[in-house]
């Protein structure tokens, strides 16, 4: 840290004024600025050492924690995103209450799957990127602009991904120009695709997607959409050991975010608890079975 301070001070003049790079007009991208001024602190510039294993000899030693299942669903007024709370390192549970869904600005959010530490760092940098743009331009970045900017950041991580440290976010938000909720999925190269109705990423995504295909329907209310998201995470946890289900003993619930024209809000745990209990009650006696449309929507399947 001391060396870093000395490096910055050497680039300033004796009057204590900011370096010229801070005052020169240029891109409204914070990442572009850092790449020009101090590129070594960007995650994309790092490389793994020849021996990357971490100390320790137990199961999962040498493996970084991985975040797993994220689901996103469009509903009548916007979009819902939910993520389980488990992080794994090999066969071990590394963390039981990790947060995988983050607000990125007033009208968008992102969920993370893949290498947890790098994924969280990427989303934090993305948050700063959007805030920096807003301060310089005096307006929010468009939904398309945000999706493209995140794509560029994922592509910059390709070197780490090819070494086994992939980051695969899921981006969603309310498009103020289009007046609707939207979901964008990515691959490890930064390739992006518009996802319609719903999408899932992570190790349990196959099982969550199967659940969503049965339970999702267009035009659902916010409450129905939250319930369907929790049902999908339950199905993922039921078949994927890296996805954590609701922890009733510790009262650890999935993180659920809702984004509408009014903005983003995280659904409070107190609001989620009765919904989780309803999901558990609906699966009692048939934990692996589908609760059915009528159980979720309360309409007898009509």
Curated annotation (Swiss-Prot):
Q: Check the record and name the InterPro entries matching this protein.
A: Ntn_hydrolases_N (IPR029055), Pept_T1A_subB (IPR000243), Proteasome_sua/b (IPR001353), Proteasome_suB-type (IPR023333), PSB_actinobac (IPR022483)
Q: Which residues form the propeptide?
A: 1-67
The source organism is Kineococcus radiotolerans (strain ATCC BAA-149 / DSM 14245 / SRS30216)
Q: What is the lineage of its organism?
A: Bacteria, Bacillati, Actinomycetota, Actinomycetes, Kineosporiales
For this record, the Gene Ontology CC terms, alphabetical, are: cytoplasm; proteasome core complex, beta-subunit complex
Gene Ontology MF terms in the entry: threonine-type endopeptidase activity
The entry's protein name is: Proteasome subunit beta
Please name the Pfam families in this protein's record. Answer: Proteasome
Task of the protein: Component of the proteasome core, a large protease complex with broad specificity involved in protein degradation.
Question: What does the record say about activity regulation?
Answer: The formation of the proteasomal ATPase ARC-20S proteasome complex, likely via the docking of the C-termini of ARC into the intersubunit pockets in the alpha-rings, may trigger opening of the gate for substrate entry. Interconversion between the open-gate and close-gate conformations leads to a dynamic regulation of the 20S proteasome proteolysis activity.
Q: Which NCBIfam families match?
A: 20S_bact_beta
């Amino acid at each position: 840290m001391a060396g870093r301070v000395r490096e910055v001070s050497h680039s300033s003049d004796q009057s204590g004024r900011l370096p010229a790079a801070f005052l020169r007009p240029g891109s409204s991208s914070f990442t572009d600025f850092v790449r020009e001024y101090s590129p070594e602190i960007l995650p994309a510039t790092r490389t793994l050492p020849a021996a990357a294993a971490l100390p320790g000899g137990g199961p999962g030693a040498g493996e970084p924690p991985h975040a797993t299942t994220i689901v996103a669903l469009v509903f009548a007024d916007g979009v819902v995103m939910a993520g389980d709370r488990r992080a794994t390192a090999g066969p071990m549970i590394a963390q039981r209450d990790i947060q995988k869904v983050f607000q990125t600005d007033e009208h968008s959010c992102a969920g993370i799957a893949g290498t947890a530490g790098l994924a969280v760092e990427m989303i934090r940098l993305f948050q700063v990127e959007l805030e920096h743009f807003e301060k310089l331009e005096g307006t929010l970045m468009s939904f398309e602009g945000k999706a493209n900017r995140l794509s560029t950041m994922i592509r910059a991580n390709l070197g780490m991904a090819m070494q086994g440290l992939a980051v695969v976010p899921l981006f969603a938000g309310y498009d103020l120009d289009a007046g609707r909720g939207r979901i964008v999925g990515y691959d490890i190269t930064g390739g992006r695709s518009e996802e319609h109705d719903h999408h899932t990423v992570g190790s349990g995504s196959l099982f969550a997607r199967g659940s969503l295909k049965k339970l999702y329907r267009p035009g659902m209310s916010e409450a129905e959409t939250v319930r369907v998201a929790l049902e999908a995470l339950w199905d993922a946890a039921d078949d994927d050991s890296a996805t954590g289900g609701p922890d009733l003993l510790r009262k650890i619930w999935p993180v659920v975010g809702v984004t509408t024209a009014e903005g983003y809000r995280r659904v409070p745990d107190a609001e989620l608890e009765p919904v989780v209990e309803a999901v558990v009650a609906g699966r009692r006696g048939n934990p692996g079975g589908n609760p059915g449309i009528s159980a979720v929507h309360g309409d007898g399947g009509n």
